[in-house]
Regions:
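Multi-pass alpha-helical membrane architecture of UbiA-family
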Residues: 1-261
Length: 261
């Protein structure tokens, strides 16, 4: 296969969000003390699931995107064939199921439900008032996918569920910003489109701020790392960085708000 279709296939997988969720999984595995092998396995499972969601999104929207001439969509523009994308989806789904169940049935079932939420979004919920629900469910369940994996399965602290859900809602609202006009032209009327640009920014930033406030509380729930002065210094630096990124979320253009989030 020549490099051009490979690059187009990677682009069709929505590499930004896919990499973000996969990286978050790896960070959660480290923060919750999962063994290295378990962390690698659950991260690979999440990567496979996210690839299937990204590719299915481009494939399902191909006809609609082609109608308005979206050259940034590899399937719609013909940069990669639908047949190749279908094959990639099949392989990624098979890998997702195998890797998920290898993490243990509790983690596996939870992760497959998470992937199902992503597919439900692609298949229709993205055009409804409830478009943020799959994101809330998926991001909210992600910590459990990690902590339930391996030989010592356990549920995460309750605040992680809520933090993940808020992060998912914020990510959805901010990720949709650059595509609001194109989506509206194809009849998509999800929550960000109903709120508009400013409303999505404000609500998205608010959701992320709420998630951050809960994340700060992880330290008291036993997820803290460094303690004393170094721990407090790290917390202050993290809050300062979050403030700067928050301004990018509210004032930025293009993909910058999502990247900052």
């Amino acid at each position: 296969m020549s490099p051009r279709p490979v690059r187009a296939l990677v682009a069709a997988a929505h590499p930004g969000p896919t990499l973000a969720v996969t990286t978050l999984t790896a960070l959660l595995a480290g923060a919750t003390g999962r063994p290295l092998g378990v962390g690698v396995l659950v991260t690979a499972a999440v990567l496979a699931g996210q690839l299937s969601i990204g590719w299915s999104n481009d494939l399902i929207d191909a006809t609609r995107d082609a109608r308005i001439g979206r050259t940034d969509k590899p399937v719609a523009s013909g940069a990669v064939s639908e047949r190749l994308v279908r094959q990639a989806i099949t392989i990624s789904l098979l890998a997702c199921v195998a890797l998920s169940l290898a993490c243990g049935w509790r983690s596996g079932v939870t992760h497959l439900a998470l992937v199902g939420a992503g597919w439900a979004y692609n298949l229709g919920l993205k055009s409804s008032l409830w478009s943020a629900v799959p994101y809330a469910v998926a991001f909210g369940a992600l910590p459990a996918v990690v902590t339930l994996a391996g030989p010592d399965p356990r549920l995460p602290v309750p605040s992680l569920f809520v933090t993940g859900a808020l992060l998912g809602v914020g990510a959805h609202l901010l990720n949709a910003l650059p595509d609001l006009a194109d989506d509206a032209a194809t009849g998509i009327r999800g929550l960000p489109h109903r709120l508009g640009d400013r409303g999505s920014r404000v609500l998205g930033a608010s959701a992320l701020a709420a998630a951050l406030s809960l994340a700060v509380g992880w330290r008291s729930d036993g997820f803290g790392g460094a303690s004393g002065f170094l721990g407090d210094l790290g917390l202050v630096m993290a809050l300062g960085l979050a403030g700067v990124l928050g301004l990018v979320v509210v004032l930025g253009r293009g993909r910058w708000p999502f990247a900052a989030a």
